[in-house]
Amino acid sequence: MRRAVLPLSGTEAGRAPLSVGAGGDRTIELDRVAEDVVFAELAELAERGEKFSVLSEEAGRRAFGAEYPLVLVDPVDGSLNAKQGVPLFGLMLAVLDGPTLADTFAGLVLNLNTGQEWTAIRRHGARRDGKRYTPMQRSDRGSIELLALESTPRSIKVAQPLVERAGKLRILGSIALSIALTSAGGFDVFCAPLPMRVFDMAASLLLLAEAGGVATNLKGDPLGPMRCDLETRSTLLCAPTRELHAEALRLLGIPR
């Protein structure tokens, strides 16, 4: 995947527009190449007798003999970064045994620039480059030192109560990588205050849960019952610990 995608990042060839993908975003050549790599691997599984379906941000839903398990594919999460040559984008894969976010039983987030790999299997913990991990320990457990936000400019205004109390602010432009880093304690809180696709969260929210973190919408409601498709959207507030999540809710004025 990295050999196919990285040479196209920040190039005219990689930015070449193709069509509008199933998720509603403009597909570029870099997206197509990345998706082709993933689908080639999945087609090999199907040829060996595995039965499943695939839901891709670019190609939509395809059946390979069974409705479930369902493989979610975002071949380039952070595609605007990739298009512009900004080295912060990744591959997101999730496997579900049902229609909702709570049905996610395996997840992969791959940083396509560094090769760092984050994986999780439901009830078997989260791993970074093959090693089990939990969030970094901090002495000031309830203070938001490093806040990460979803990348639209309006997010800063909507999340102003968090921004004002955070020590520093980061905006990466990749949902999957932002949540993965939060799961390990790299960010104290990640907030998407405007509705985003639940599809984009699936793999990294499993990482977060398996590492002991907490995720809700901005009202403090659980995300598990939400359908995992290309249409369903939700706000997101997540943190590596319950204390940090509770502090973020408090700053947003959400009673618990």
Show the residue positions of the predicted features:
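Buried hydrophobic positions in well-ordered alpha/beta secondary-structure cores of metabolic enzymes
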Residues: 31, 78-79, 182, 208
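Solvent-exposed alpha-helices and their adjacent loops that cap or buttress functional pockets
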Residues: 61-65, 83-85, 99-102, 110-111, ...
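DPxDG-like acidic metal-binding loop motif
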Residues: 67-123
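Short helix-loop capping/hinge motifs at secondary-structure junctions, enriched
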Residues: 100, 125-128, 243-247
